[in-house]
Amino acid sequence: LPFFLGRGPVELAGLAGQVPMVAPENVASVGLRSVDDLERLNVRGTGVHAFTMRDIDERGMTAVIREAIAAASSGTAGFHVSYDMDSVDPSEAPGVGTPVPGGLTYREAHLAMELIGDSGSMASVEVVEVNPVMDVANKTAVLGVGLIMSALGKRIL
């Protein structure tokens, strides 16, 4: 993220010939609960929209995701979703590099992706931070595939 926001070595930050490659006000990070000092610097005071687990607990996933979508799609032709599986609680997604308790539930994760898909503004999507060595019975990978399917339109009915 820092490189896309124009931070870091110019060889990387300016790779696309435009610095920043992504306007900070069009970036939303949802489900934060364990943020290191460098990450905190890359969010605070940059214009990035950051939503913690407390925001989700207090306001609900629907309100948070709608605000994130509004930010990401404001003045853009669409947005990219990079879904970090570390955001999901390790009881649901054990196969991640940084398992931290208190993450998103299975349903919160799917609801977020369903709402993103419903927006019609998602241009691309990826799932990141899956560690097969740490996974249990492929649970995290299967959830990741399911989340992509939710973003692409799979629904209960």
Predicted segments, located by residue:
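Active-site glycine-rich loop that binds ribose-phosphate moieties when present
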Residues: P2-D37, A63
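Solvent-exposed alpha-helices and their adjacent loops that cap or buttress functional pockets
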Residues: A16-V22, N42, S73, G117
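Catalytic cores of soluble, metal-dependent hydrolases
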Residues: T46-L157
